[in-house]
């Protein structure tokens, strides 16, 4: 089961305490930008570099309460998500977007009821080449994010587990 953060109350600190041996804890590299700072769901992945075509393609699908994890290689030269993609994600039922890279339109994104975590905000848009991979394991912040695993995020950080800890 996945869902919007307002449907189930959780704290990553409590989940870490209760499931210490079965969760991975991300290094604190990302900050909150979205209107929801607590979100969770089964995760899907995209691996790209300074190109957000595959990010858009993923967010155009039915999110079904999932979280999109974007491995952008940590680039700070351009944004992989802006307000239109964040709005699209919200409308299509995604609960959150986690970006190892940058976003833009941060003020607008902060008003949307979706979780968004990223390294930084930068005004420059990305290229549109369509290069990259979808639904593959990606690694950043000291963790491997595998499609189908569960991601839990709140102001304390991000944790990942192989199963739904809230079921």
Regions found by a protein language model. Give the residues of each.
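A generic "binding-loop/recognition-motif" signal
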Residues: 85, 156-157
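Short, charged beta-turn/beta-strand-edge "cap" motif at the junction between a beta-strand
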Residues: 144, 157-159
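Feature captures the catalytic cores and cofactor-binding loops of soluble hydro-lyases/lyases
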Residues: 2-147, 164-167
């Amino acid at each position: 089961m996945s869902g919007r953060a307002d449907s189930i109350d959780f704290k990553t600190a409590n989940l870490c305490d209760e499931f210490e041996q079965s969760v991975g804890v991300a290094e604190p590299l990302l900050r909150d930008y979205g209107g929801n700072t607590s979100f969770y769901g089964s995760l899907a992945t995209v691996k790209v570099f300074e190109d957000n075509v595959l990010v858009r393609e993923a967010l155009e699908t039915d999110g079904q309460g999932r979280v999109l994890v974007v491995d952008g290689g940590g680039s700070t030269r351009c944004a992989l998500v802006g307000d239109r993609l964040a709005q699209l994600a919200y409308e299509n039922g995604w609960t959150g977007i986690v970006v190892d890279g940058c976003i833009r339109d941060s003020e607008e994104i902060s008003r949307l009821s979706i979780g968004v975590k990223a390294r930084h905000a930068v005004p420059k848009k990305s290229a549109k080449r369509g290069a990259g991979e979808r639904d593959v394991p990606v690694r950043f912040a000291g963790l491997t994010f595998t499609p189908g695993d569960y991601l839990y995020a709140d102001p304390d950080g991000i944790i990942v587990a192989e199963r739904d800890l809230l079921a």
